[in-house]
Design a protein with these regions (language model features):
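Oxyanion-hole/transition-state-stabilizing segment in secreted/luminal serine hydrolases
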Residues: 3-60, 75, 79-98, 225
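Eukaryote-biased feature marking scaffold/signaling PDZ-domain proteins and nuclear chromatin regulators
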Residues: 29-31, 76-78, 141, 179, ...
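A short acidic, glycine-rich active-site loop
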Residues: 55-60, 108-121
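A structural motif corresponding to the C-terminal end of an alpha-helix
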Residues: 68-80, 120-144
Length: 245
């Protein structure tokens, strides 16, 4: 779909319509920063439908598709790329909300995250970073930044208490007590009463919004600390992301 965009905008810009002025000029496509964020849903579905061995063996192929997308953008004139790795899957509260009994030893890490899921995410990110290094040599005119979203989000989980946040394995929105589970904004029963999954009073005190998605506070924190280069390779701010290092 992207390959059609430059040619279509060029065609529209030939006219004098006011709408044409809102479209990027052809020269701007090579100056743009292209952001790729892939892997989260691939692993989520993999955990649901595949054995761990099969999922692990599928990861190089998934990463190859990311690399192919970068190459296609490069061939279309793209030169600057901001590539996110995948986050700590095991640290999403949805993983533990239904656990009513104590987990087996080694199932959780010291912050309450499901260890095997984070291990798989780390493997995915290792393969992705190796591929990014290879892309840098294959695409000599490209500026490619690897963004370590995993480390940023894991740091937030690990330091939630220091930051004055609630237990990172709890959620702001939704009702999850014992065997009663009503998801954020959905209708359901709790203590034999009809309710709608409620929101907490202060979302800025929580890491997770609904067990899967992060709160606005968390997303802002991660954005600030990746945009300034704290969790990027090379370690430079987004303002420098369009420059080769």
């Amino acid at each position: 779909m992207y390959s059609l965009f430059p040619s279509l905008t060029t065609g529209f810009s030939v006219g004098s319509s006011p709408e044409a002025e809102k479209l990027p000029r052809a020269v701007e496509f090579s100056k743009a920063l292209y952001t790729l964020d892939i892997g989260q849903n691939d692993l989520t579905m993999g955990f649901r439908t595949m054995s761990l061995d099969k999922l692990r063996s599928a990861i190089p192929g998934i990463v190859d598709q990311v690399a192919e997308a970068v190459k296609n953008l490069y061939n279309e004139g793209g030169r600057s790329f901001w590539i996110h790795n995948t986050g700590p899957h095991g640290c999403m509260p949805v993983n533990v909300l239904y656990n009513t009994s104590a987990p087996s030893p080694g199932y959780l890490d010291k912050y309450g995250c499901v260890k095997f899921k984070n291990d798989m995410a780390v493997f995915f990110n290792t393969v992705l970073k190796e591929r990014v290094v290879k892309l840098r040599s294959e695409l000599p005119l490209a500026a490619i930044t690897y963004v370590d979203v995993f480390s940023a989000k894991y740091w937030l989980v690990a330091n939630a208490k220091i930051l004055g946040l609630a237990n990172p394995m709890t959620v702001c929105c939704g009702y999850h007590v014992g065997n009663d589970h009503v998801w954020c904004g959905f209708k359901g029963k709790a203590k034999n009463k009809d309710i709608v999954g409620p929101s907490c009073v202060d979302p800025s005190k929580f890491v997770s919004w609904d067990g899967v998605h992060y709160t606005e506070f968390s997303n802002r924190w991660v954005a600030q600390h990746t945009l300034n280069g704290n969790f990027t390779d090379p370690p430079s701010s987004i303002a420098q992301a369009c420059h080769r290092h």
